[in-house]
Amino acid sequence: MMSDEKNLGVSQKLVSPSRSTSSCSSKQGSRQDSWEVVEGLRGEMNYTQEPPVQKGFLLKKRKWPLKGWHKRFFYLDKGILKYAKSQTDIEREKLHGCIDVGLSVMSVKKSSKCIDLDTEEHIYHLKVKSEEVFDEWVSKLRHHRMYRQNEIAMFPHEVNHFFSGSTITDSSSGVFDSISSRKRSSISKQNLFQTGSNVSFSCGGETRVPLWLQSSEDMEKCSKDLAHCHAYLVEMSQLLQSMDVLHRTYSAPAINAIQGGSFESPKKEKRSHRRWRSRAIGKDAKGTLQVPKPFSGPVRLHSSNPNLSTLDFGEEKNYSDGSETSSEFSKMQEDLCHIAHKVYFTLRSAFNIMSAEREKLKQLMEQDASSSPSAQVIGLKNALSSALAQNTDLKERLRRIHAESLLLDSPAVAKSGDNLAEENSRDENRALVHQLSNESRLSITDSLSEFFDAQEVLLSPSSSENEISDDDSYVSDISDNLSLDNLSNDLDNERQTLGPVLDSGREAKSRRRTCLPAPCPSSSNISLWNILRNNIGKDLSKVAMPVELNEPLNTLQRLCEELEYSELLDKAAQIPSPLERMVYVAAFAISAYASSYYRAGSKPFNPVLGETYECIREDKGFQFFSEQVSHHPPISACHAESRNFVFWQDVRWKNKFWGKSMEIVPIGTTHVTLPVFGDHFEWNKVTSCIHNILSGQRWIEHYGEIVIKNLHDDSCYCKVNFIKAKYWSTNAHEIEGTVFDRSGKAVHRLFGKWHESIYCGGGSSSACVWRANPMPKGYEQYYSFTQFALELNEMDPSSKSLLPPTDTRFRPDQRFLEEGNLEEAEIQKQRIEQLQRERRRVLEENHVEHQPRFFRKSDDDSWVSNGTYLELRKDLGFSKLDHPVLW
């Protein structure tokens, strides 16, 4: 066993020349401080020796949201790692978890004696106190992982075998079934990454078939196996003919000798072979091989080959028992058994290859079938067309009503506006009924129709009544509901911006672009594994990435995207009840994550130190500006003002790569004040995680808890829980929130999905508080930007002279990427990064600390506006300042 461990270590060093080269050029201590990805089974490697069982206590990091480490007993057998509180619980099958190390990405960090197992669904963090125990566990895990991967490669249809008897939970079997079905080919994919193969990460239908056809070496191997099998069968036929000659040559008296003397031993041998057969193949494997001519009859021979069960090799009693004849006949028996073994293993290998290829073809056919248009899709398209037509008609009616209202004198308009505000307040107070019955709280996916039937409040400027009939309170058709929501949002915007500001906002909105100058490039030729494999557990904000992985937006502009639904704060500023104001503030905090649902495939540009960005939106009524106030650590600060609210925050992100997923942990606090009520709200941000970084369809999820407090009024607070996705449940991206009063009693319930809509209440009487805007046409070709994101980097010629030269829109690499010039964008990106490194070196050599121009640090170490940006913009003061050269 020790020799096998040495050979395994040598093979792992040989299969990774790039890693060994880099480690040779670095010091041993620095290599121990970094994470090392453990290599898996590669190429034609065959690891069939069963490793011994390993067990003992290890420290395991507690699952989120719990913190710290707890002691658990781990049991490793044949590549399956089980853990429980004690060894007794393991024996009783009272497991806390079960990990297939063959399907996991394993990384180790020797300096801290940590072992990470990334199963894509969960990341298991293990720690060992003793260095000897750490080395022992790492060695055993390597061997078990290689053994398990070899087993999966040989028997891909038996991945679920080791989980069939597990009693973790009732739903565990379903979890492992889904894991195995999705990961059946993960070993081969991992081998491709480790050998440096240029694998495409695109998930489009045009690349699935070529990737499948590239693995034609499996079919070639299958053809060779069948050819060898044919040769073995011919050789077996010749041996059987020779044995038949011996049978006819010798006389009958020898038969009795064989029957009386040497027949007991083969019976025992037959029983032992049966035990071997059941152990190797299983009780369900009963495949037979019909051998063609020249077999003349049902000659039976003792053989342990299960695939030759139809050949009757047991009639040895017809042969002579002479010493010379017996030895010759025994040699023929051994040769025949040996060849039969070869035939069996060759056919089994060919069968496994054919099964894997059949599974690939079946998956492709299912994907193609699911992508074809169905009657349901056609019906939804028709419903959408009718909804758009109805929406156009309702908007036309609204314009006529608004035109009539403008003909009135100004006092009447003011009076109408007051009536609208009062009416809106009464209706919204009625809509947000305290629906706190847990029995009526339904699952989003199970009762989606009820949520679309939720009550929607629609107010017309010409309406003077508060009563709404029951027939008008509920909308049963999906398209009608969407139309009414859009119309209600349009009406709210118009009511908030009556007068000249409305006209200028409409003109500005009509001038804004609806698509980017060029579509996004393909990043399928970039090997993310080569970039990220040496950065396991590191902060990726310090790792240089190719420009193709970026989107033509900056982190400072991403902060502005959080104000896409600022009308929620405008609504909150009009509601006298602090409890209901908290509902809209919570909806605004949740809406900041909506655009990220479609944007898991790219990352924003990192701002350089001193870079700024401004966004003046007359149509939404706010003025926004931001600045990169620190580079290490990277901190971005922003500030926005409106007549109804003030918004500011400073955020820094820590990105960590865990093998198959990447965690984004934000650090900072968001603040919103409503001057009309004197409210000051603050809340934290939740953790984000991007899955399937290296292969498959990337997707993002947010999990954690947001706590919203009013620092100037303790009458209420809110908790919003972003629920972590579970693989045995279809309810992903859900949120649940509760507004509590001063005594801790729940007053309002919030639920929904953070990328779709938020509801308040319970059951069919729930009121829709917020719904995401529809995505623009062809958004997949333009980085999956929302309409608001498409407008962020647009350069307005009229305001170009008002911007400081440090504004993001002047940044050349980002502009070249937006225009589709990748080569020039990469050149400019490297030049800007080098320029920033030189600036930082000069500042450090002269012991000069960078001072942000438009933000200052407050007493609580947060960054707030110093009030100079908007004043300088009014007086064209940016041209009088000395600005650093950023690009």
From Swiss-Prot:
It comes from the Eukaryota. Expressed in a subset of small lymphocytes (at protein level). Expressed at high concentration in kidney, lymph node and thymus. Expressed at moderate concentration in stomach, jejunum, ileum, appendix, spleen, leukocytes, trachea, lung and thyroid gland. Expressed at low concentration in whole brain, esophagus, duodenum, ileocecum, colon, skeletal muscle, bone marrow, placenta and mammary gland. Isoform 1a, isoform 1b, isoform 1c and isoform 1d are highly expressed in brain, bone marrow, colon, kidney, lung, skeletal muscle, spleen, thymus and thyroid. Not expressed in heart and liver. Phosphorylation is enhanced in vitro by phorbol-12-myristate-13-acetate (PMA), forskolin and calcium ionophore A23187. Phosphorylation seems to be stimulated in conditions of low cell-cell (or cell-matrix) adhesion. Residues 1-35, 261-326 are annotated as: Disordered. GO terms for biological process: bile acid biosynthetic process. Keywords: Cell membrane, Cell projection, Cytoplasm, Endoplasmic reticulum, Lipid transport, Lipid-binding, Membrane, Nucleus, Phosphoprotein, Transport. PROSITE patterns: OSBP, PH_DOMAIN. Changing K61A: Abolishes plasma membrane targeting and nuclear localization. A motif (FFAT 1) lies at residues 161-167. The modification Phosphoserine is found at residues 16, 34, 200, 251, 265, 304, 309, 320, 323, 371-372, 410, 425, 437, 440. This is Oxysterol-binding protein-related protein 3. It comes from Homo sapiens (Human).
